[in-house]
A protein has these predicted regions:
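Divalent metal-cofactor coordination and adjacent catalytic microenvironments
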Residues: 1-176
C-alpha cells in the first residue's frame, strides 16, 4: 500500500503523518549546499522520508506545552509552548494553531539525512573504542553513539522542547 502524505496544517488533524510535504522540502533544500540526496530522490521516497522524519521527531522530542487537540495524530500543534523569539524579554508562546517553521525545517533536514542513511540503525563500529588483533583485545565506549536526530535538526528543535534521553534519571518540570 502506497503512503499518502498528510501534512499537519495547524488544525490538529487526526490523520496527519508529516510536518512538511515535498514542496516544503524542495524550498528548504533549494539553498542547501548538500541537497543532492534530496534532489535525486523520487517523490515517493521524499514523502516516505518526511513521514519517517516526523515519526522520529515526535518519538525523540518532548515539546513544551500540551497538544492543542487531544485527538490529533502528531505532537504539533501545541498549546502553551514557549517561544523564546516571540515577545522579547517577556517570552511568549507559539500559536496553538500552527506548526513552527523550525519544526517543518527540522523535518526536511531529517528527511534528507534519512535518504542518505538509516539513522535508526547502529553504524558499523559504533561503540568500539579500540581493537587489538594480537591476543584479541577489544574495548567499548558507551558514549560513541550517533544520535537518531541529526545535530542540525536538534538545533532547530531545541528552543521548543528537549531531546528525550533514555534512562537519564531526570524529569522535565513545567511551571503552570
Amino acid at each position: 500500500m502506497a503512503l499518502t502524505l498528510i501534512k499537519e496544517d495547524g488544525t490538529g488533524k487526526v490523520d496527519a503523518n508529516a510536518y512538511a510535504n515535498a514542496a516544503d522540502g524542495a524550498a528548504y533544500h533549494d539553498g542547501h549546499l548538500f541537497a543532492s540526496a534530496w534532489t535525486a530522490a523520487t517523490l515517493a521516497n521524499k514523502e516516505t522520508a518526511l513521514a519517517m522524519a516526523t515519526r522520529l521527531i515526535d518519538a525523540e522530542y518532548q515539546f513544551d506545552g500540551v497538544k492543542a487537540n487531544e485527538a490529533q495524530a502528531l505532537q504539533w500543534p501545541r498549546a502553551g509552548c514557549h517561544d523564546p523569539d516571540a515577545d522579547g524579554w517577556n517570552g511568549g508562546t507559539v500559536a496553538d494553531n500552527t506548526v513552527p517553521k523550525a519544526v517543518m525545517e527540522a523535518t526536511c533536514e531529517m528527511a534528507r539525512e534519512l535518504l542518505i542513511v538509516d539513522r535508526t540503525a547502529a553504524p558499523v563500529g559504533e561503540g568500539l573504542k579500540y581493537y587489538n588483533d594480537g591476543s584479541v583485545q577489544t574495548g567499548y565506549d558507551k558514549g560513541d553513539r550517533r544520535p537518531v536526530i541529526s545535530h542540525v535538526a536538534q538545533a532547530l528543535l531545541m528552543k521548543f522542547g528537549s531531546l528525550v534521553k533514555s534512562k537519564s534519571g531526570a524529569v522535565r518540570l513545567t511551571r503552570t
